[in-house]
Amino acid sequence: MKKIRPLTEADVTAESAFFMQRRQVLKALGISAAALSLPSTAQADLFSWFKGNDRPKAPAGKPLEFSQPAAWRSDLALTPEDKVTGYNNFYEFGLDKADPAANAGSLKTEPWTLKISGEVAKPFTLDYDDLTHRFPLEERIYRMRCVEAWSMVVPWIGFPLYKLLAQAQPTSHAKYVAFETLYAPDDMPGQKDRFIGGGLKYPYVEGLRLDEAMHPLTLMTVGVYGKALPPQNGAPIRLIVPWKYGFKGIKSVVSIKLTRERPPTTWNLSAPNEYGFYANVNPHVDHPRWSQATERFIGSGGILDVQRQPTLLFNGYANEVASLYRGLNLRENF
């Protein structure tokens, strides 16, 4: 694996980055123009929302013990934590960015069971304590690129997925890894009400090729900003694959199953012409409704401070992962 370039201060996104709904992003900078046509009170509400005022308080996660490997270490000060935990994409708790923080308090994360099964020699189950104690945790500052054409950089805490899979010992028949979110309609209102949950089929499911899952960059994430994940960010454990669009980062995972066949994935089932299985960040393959050539890099500033920048192939991780797709037509296999 090639040496990874250390991130600089210009790379690090403030925690205010977790905002902007999918339907809002479609209009890109048009949101600010629309805001100017609103009544003054509505303008004030919108700009306060963007700045992070009046956000619901997120439950405090417990501090975690973790290392900071040199490849990911940074001494940079991060923006206040409530800005990352206040705005999220987690449709199980609603479509608006503030909904998960407002509604995810109903999610019960203790006890928790994560089952590893399928084409493995040694299936096993992890409980809640195992998630933060079975494997050494490390903090990694990763770029994150949403399919909605906005981006950020976040310090996640977790362990490489390959360490978990190695303990399960995949068989020679294992070709893919299927992931599944908790199904708990009484705790996750979006699973019970299609209006709240955006009409998706639940539970949320995702998948990777086995070689993608075994790549050192692929992270099972249990914390952010030094503490355990809050419910709205995917507690107690979620997936982060930094060279793929954010919807591949399945949250609140209860099942990891190795399979012979390619597993179904939620957004691909919902709109296969818009959301592919691979979902690799690619500036040369547009979404049917908007360009992916550039992105809005979201930092700590307000709505007028958002900067547009070129999108990098594989989200800037091409040196590490491009070899996985040698010979694959990335336009057809988006």
UniProtKB/Swiss-Prot annotation:
Enzyme Commission number(s): 1.8.5.-
Residue sites binding Mo-molybdopterin per the record: N88, Y91, E92, C146, T181, N233, R238, G249, I250, K251
Which PROSITE patterns does this one have?
TAT
| Record-linked Gene3D superfamilies | Oxidoreductase, molybdopterin-binding domain
One GO term in the molecular function aspect is: oxidoreductase activity, acting on a sulfur group of donors, quinone or similar compound as acceptor
Enzyme class, broadest EC rank: oxidoreductase
Broad class of where this protein is predominantly found: periplasm
Q: Which CDD domains match?
A: YedY_like_Moco
Question: What is the residue range of the signal peptide feature?
Answer: 1-44
Q: How is it modified after translation?
A: Predicted to be exported by the Tat system. The position of the signal peptide cleavage has not been experimentally proven.
Instruction: Share an example GO biological-process annotation for this protein.
Output: protein repair
The protein's matches in Pfam families, at most eight in alphabetical order, are given as: Oxidored_molyb (PF00174)
The entry's keywords: Metal-binding, Molybdenum, Oxidoreductase, Periplasm, Signal
Record-linked PANTHER family: PROTEIN-METHIONINE-SULFOXIDE REDUCTASE, PROTEIN-METHIONINE-SULFOXIDE REDUCTASE CATALYTIC SUBUNIT MSRP
Complexes and interactors: Heterodimer of a catalytic subunit (MsrP) and a heme-binding subunit (MsrQ).
For this chain, the family text in UniProt reads:
Belongs to the MsrP family.
Outline what the protein does. Answer: Part of the MsrPQ system that repairs oxidized periplasmic proteins containing methionine sulfoxide residues (Met-O), using respiratory chain electrons. Thus protects these proteins from oxidative-stress damage caused by reactive species of oxygen and chlorine generated by the host defense mechanisms. MsrPQ is essential for the maintenance of envelope integrity under bleach stress, rescuing a wide series of structurally unrelated periplasmic proteins from methionine oxidation, including the primary periplasmic chaperone SurA and the lipoprotein Pal.
Q: Report what the protein is called.
A: Protein-methionine-sulfoxide reductase catalytic subunit MsrP
